[in-house]
């Protein structure tokens, strides 16, 4: 199911562990967040912790098991999906008896949110409990539990001194772990183009559009500039894969880390995306259409949704709103402020 973001911000991936369970904490409020799926040992420990906490049977996956890395990642993501869905259903049921949680959900939405305006209009009437239940079921959605893979963290692995096939490389196994999970969310690819890894995505059905032109699993590219976006977008389109979001991250100022760039500031980079967005979409869609037809796959008549988002160095509400309004962005990533909140990380 494709859905529009309720919020104009998202919680980016932070390190290997800071956002490892953030969806459990905030997805019920409709907020998207990102889990790093690099460290399978950490995810296995977290799975044990949440199984114990939720009184769910825990079946350990040993690091001696075949394909243990992918299996651990799938198992942890399936648990996150299960807990988030359960928590969200509990949240909606509780809202029928006590409106404080629902009020909090609505209060956190932007002032111009269509959902917030709909709720205000709805509450002006003397509605029955059954009408409230229908409104909640129709309008409230949980936030996504997206995942992040650093494409260059793709170490080769060995078993009894023999090199395993490429699909057992670290990033390949992480991708497989997500692809086989129950999550209906996005794979965020960061750290640049990895042709072998990108080609491997072709093997998984969830990344292709269904008969309704919808994607169960989407691809988000984390990029530093427009050139990187169109090169990677075209590469994936040739494989029949659609990029649903280009997430621009500042190379100079993002959560205390910096990476090599030519020193371009975010303003000129975002301006190029603002002026070239339609070109980016149409160019990649033309390539995608040909590829899907050659694969005898369903191909939408029109381009699927594409979001342009940004993160890094945003410090005030005014800056946030300026980025949304002037550069026409869909969402802004706020990372560092949430490190101060135990409710998020």
Model-derived regions: residue spans:
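Structural signal for hydrophobic packing residues in well-ordered secondary-structure cores
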Residues: 46, 50, 54, 84, ...
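Charged, low-complexity, helix/coiled-coil-prone segments
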Residues: 110-122, 142-144, 170-180, 210-232, ...
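Core catalytic machinery and nucleic-acid-binding channels of phosphodiester-processing enzymes
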Residues: 166-167, 175, 181-195, 204-207, ...
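Long, compositionally biased, glycine/small-hydrophobic-enriched stretches that function as flexible linkers
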Residues: 1-197
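Gly-rich Lys/Arg/Thr-decorated short loops/hinges at beta-loop-alpha junctions or inter-strand turns
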Residues: 151-159, 181-183, 213-214, 258-272
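Glycine-rich phosphate/ribose-binding loops and adjacent secondary-structure elements
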Residues: 221-345
């Amino acid at each position: 199911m494709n859905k529009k973001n309720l919020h104009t911000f998202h919680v980016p991936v932070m390190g290997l562990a800071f956002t490892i369970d953030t969806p459990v904490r905030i997805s019920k409020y409709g907020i998207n967040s990102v889990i790093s799926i690099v460290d399978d040992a950490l995810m296995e420990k977290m799975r044990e912790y949440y199984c114990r906490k939720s009184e769910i049977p825990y079946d350990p996956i040993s690091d001696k098991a075949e394909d243990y890395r992918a299996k651990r990642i799938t198992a942890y993501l399936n648990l996150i999906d299960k807990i988030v869905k359960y928590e969200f259903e509990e949240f909606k049921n509780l809202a029928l008896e006590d409106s404080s949680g629902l009020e909090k959900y609505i209060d956190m939405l932007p002032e111009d949110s269509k959902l917030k305006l709909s709720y205000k209009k709805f509450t002006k009437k003397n509605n029955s409990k059954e009408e409230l239940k229908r409104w909640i079921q129709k309008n409230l959605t949980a936030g996504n539990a997206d995942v992040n893979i650093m494409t260059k963290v793709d170490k080769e692995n060995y078993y009894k001194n023999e090199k395993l096939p490429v699909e057992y490389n670290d990033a390949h196994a992480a991708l497989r772990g997500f692809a086989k999970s129950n999550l209906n969310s996005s794979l965020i690819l960061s750290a640049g183009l990895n042709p072998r890894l990108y080609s491997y995505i072709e093997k998984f059905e969830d990344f292709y559009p269904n008969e309704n032109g919808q994607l169960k699993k989407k691809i988000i590219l984390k990029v530093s500039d427009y050139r990187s976006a169109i090169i990677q977008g075209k590469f994936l389109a040739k494989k029949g894969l659609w990029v649903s979001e280009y997430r621009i991250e500042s190379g100079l100022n993002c959560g205390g880390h910096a990476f090599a760039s030519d020193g371009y500031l975010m303003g000129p980079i975002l301006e190029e995306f603002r002026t070239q967005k339609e070109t980016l979409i149409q160019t990649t869609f033309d390539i995608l259409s040909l590829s899907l037809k050659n694969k005898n796959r369903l191909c939408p008549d029109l381009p699927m949704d594409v979001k342009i988002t940004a993160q890094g160095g945003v410090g005030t509400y005014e800056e946030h709103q300026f980025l949304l309004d002037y550069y026409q962005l869909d969402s802004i990533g706020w990372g560092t402020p949430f490190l101060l909140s135990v409710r998020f990380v």
